């Protein structure tokens, strides 16, 4: 992990949920406190669920500021997933409650922001504040998908979190598209465009 630059408040930003076929895309923004370090920060995808659940409350407790925001399924379908992700990131930074001196965003592009920003490829594995943001975004989105599993128990959202797994494809073919599915994503759109693929009585 990189050391935290001594140039003021550094905000890390990352997202969770760009690839799934269902659910919102979630972004988090975190300003870490150098005086209150957190051991074990890493890209959320490299951590176990147990580790993420242990670290998330520590991040909330020790960070100078943090915020989580999202873009809805409807916004994803209207804007496309890239622009919806940028919107969620903008909302997270705006919700911090303080103005960072620099925003560092995981990936190769930044959303339009009113403060200086830079994109950091693989930043979730090299920049502590981005790693912290990735953990918050991932844990919040996972909790949302577990809640959706209670609403739509036939789809297995608690296990695959909306990603295009074989289990999810089988559920789509068997039960059809529901409100939380992203209609602009190709596998979902294919079902909508081909009613003969739907189970009887499920097309809405």
Swiss-Prot record:
EC number of this enzyme: 3.1.26.4
Cofactors named for this entry: Mn(2+); Mg(2+)
Pfam families linked to this entry: RNase_HII
UniProt-annotated binding residues for a divalent metal cation: 14-15, 106
Localization, UniProt: Cytoplasm
Top-level taxon of the source organism: Bacteria
Catalytically driven reaction(s): Endonucleolytic cleavage to 5'-phosphomonoester
Cofactor note: Manganese or magnesium. Binds 1 divalent metal ion per monomer in the absence of substrate. May bind a second metal ion after substrate binding.
GO MF annotation list: manganese ion binding; RNA binding; RNA-DNA hybrid ribonuclease activity
GO biological process: DNA replication, removal of RNA primer; mismatch repair
Keyword Nuclease: yes
Signal sequence annotation: none
GO cellular component terms, semicolon-separated: cytoplasm; ribonuclease H2 complex
Keyword field: Cytoplasm, Endonuclease, Hydrolase, Manganese, Metal-binding, Nuclease
Statement: the UniProt record of this protein carries the keyword Hydrolase: yes
Residue ranges of domain RNase H type-2 in the record: 8-197
Record family assignment: Belongs to the RNase HII family.
Biological role: Endonuclease that specifically degrades the RNA of RNA-DNA hybrids.
PANTHER family in alphabetical order: RIBONUCLEASE H2 SUBUNIT A (PTHR10954), RIBONUCLEASE HII (PTHR10954:SF18)
NCBIfam families: PRK00015.1-3 (NF000595), PRK00015.1-4 (NF000596)
Official protein name in the record: Ribonuclease HII
Species whose genome carries this gene: Aromatoleum aromaticum (strain DSM 19018 / LMG 30748 / EbN1)
Source lineage: Bacteria, Pseudomonadati, Pseudomonadota, Betaproteobacteria, Rhodocyclales
């Amino acid at each position: 992990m990189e050391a935290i630059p001594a140039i003021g408040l550094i905000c890390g930003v990352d997202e969770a949920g760009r690839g799934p076929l269902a659910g919102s895309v979630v972004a988090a923004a975190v300003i870490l406190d150098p005086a209150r370090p957190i051991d074990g920060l890493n890209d959320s995808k490299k951590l176990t669920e147990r580790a993420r659940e242990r670290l998330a409350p520590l991040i909330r407790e020790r960070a100078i500021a943090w915020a989580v925001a999202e873009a809805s399924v409807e916004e994803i379908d209207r804007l496309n997933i890239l622009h919806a992700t940028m919107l969620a990131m903008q909302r997270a930074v705006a919700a911090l409650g303080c103005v960072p001196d620099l925003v560092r965003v995981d990936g190769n592009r930044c959303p339009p922001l009113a403060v200086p920003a830079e994109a950091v490829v693989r930043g979730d594995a090299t920049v502590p504040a981005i790693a912290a943001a990735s953990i918050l975004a991932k844990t919040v989105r996972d909790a949302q998908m577990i809640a959706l599993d209670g609403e739509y128990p036939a789809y297995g959202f608690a296990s695959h979190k909306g990603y295009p797994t074989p289990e999810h494809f089988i559920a789509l073919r068997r039960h059809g598209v529901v409100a939380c599915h992203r209609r602009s994503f190709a596998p979902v759109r294919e079902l909508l465009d081909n009613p003969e693929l739907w189970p009887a009585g499920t097309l809405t």
